[in-house]
Curated annotation (Swiss-Prot):
Disulfide cysteine pairs (residue numbers): C5-C10, C6-C14, C9-C17
Annotated compartments: Secreted
Purpose of the protein: Toxin which activates the particulate form of guanylate cyclase and increases cyclic GMP levels within the host intestinal epithelial cells.
Record keyword Lipid metabolism present: no
Protein name from the UniProt record: Heat-stable enterotoxin ST-2
A Pfam family that the UniProt record links to this protein: Enterotoxin_ST
Family: Belongs to the heat-stable enterotoxin family.
Superkingdom of the source species: Bacteria
Organism: Escherichia coli
C-alpha cells in the first residue's frame, strides 16, 4: 500500500508532501 501524506506533512516519514 502506498502512503499518501496530507496537505500538512503530519508524518516525518512522508517523502513527498503536496
Amino acid at each position: 500500500n502506498t502512503f499518501y501524506c496530507c496537505e500538512l506533512c503530519c508524518n516525518p516519514a512522508c517523502a513527498g508532501c503536496y
